[in-house]
Amino acid sequence: MNNSNVAGLKGNFFTKFAIEQDIAIKDDGTLVKKVTTTINNTFRYDGWLNAVYQNWLRLYVPEGSKLIEKNIEIDLEQKNELGKEVWAAFSRTPPLSSTSSSFTYELPFKVKKGSTYKMLIQKQGGYIPRMIIVVNGKKLFDFDLKKDIELEFKI
């Protein structure tokens, strides 16, 4: 997930981000993932430092992933970039409020029970989001993403 403030001002200083990955593993090994980004604009409107936080977000997923559902404010595009599927959207978060955007998709591969699942999460410069990873309804990880990290867990 890549987030970009496109409105200017100093809104990044007042926003807090959380990114939740909810992974459902079906009996046949199919992986369905819902990725939700929540933006909380914590400061009042003042016309100079903070206003409506306008976010251009892009979700990069493995090539061949199938989009099942999206809950977004403004749909921008779907394309292939850097060997990944990319789904882009736009959201606006007024001062002293929060908004969420989500994408649900099926990954292009399957996993076997008992195997180890590896996930690389790359930190985007400029902010430290809260990362929450849920697998089959159980929260496995909850941390502030301060650097790139590879997570592993048993299926």
Predicted regions mapped to residue ranges:
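Lumenal/extracellular ectodomains and adaptor appendage modules
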Residues: M1-I155
